[in-house]
């Protein structure tokens, strides 16, 4: 993630995990929402994936064991991008998972909108059986 942030020519980052298959409706217009993550409330992801708590359309926490899931896609811009870049550049945080860094951002006051596009189709590929 740090390499992508450092290579950015502007203060915008679309983060997509590499083991996903999704349709165009999943990310179409994502930048219109400002800093946001895609969430899943329709059991498209396994129970053991990272979930989110949401209050008034904002993510308040990322953690395991939650019903709504983070769809492993996020868009960060402006102040959120700057903080993400700062947190990712720290060597002591290099072993943290992205969702742990997102929680640090939320604790510092960054607002991350939760978005679930109506026509989103998304699937995580863990093995050939998932195709």
Functional labels for PLM-detected ranges:
Residues 53-58, 107, 118-119:
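Short acidic-glycine loop/turn motifs at beta-strand connectors
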């Amino acid at each position: 993630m740090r390499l992508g942030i450092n290579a950015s020519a502007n203060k915008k980052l679309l983060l997509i995990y590499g083991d996903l298959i999704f349709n165009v409706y999943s990310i179409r217009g994502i930048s219109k929402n400002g800093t946001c993550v895609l969430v899943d409330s329709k059991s498209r992801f396994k129970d053991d994936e990272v979930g989110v708590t949401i209050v008034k359309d904002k993510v308040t926490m990322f953690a395991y064991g939650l019903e709504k899931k983070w769809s492993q896609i996020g868009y960060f811009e402006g102040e959120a991008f700057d903080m993400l870049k700062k947190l990712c550049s720290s060597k002591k945080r290099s072993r943290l998972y992205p969702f742990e860094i997102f929680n640090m951002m939320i604790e510092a006051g960054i607002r991350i909108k939760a978005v679930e596009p109506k026509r989103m189709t998304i699937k995580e590929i863990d093995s050939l059986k998932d195709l």
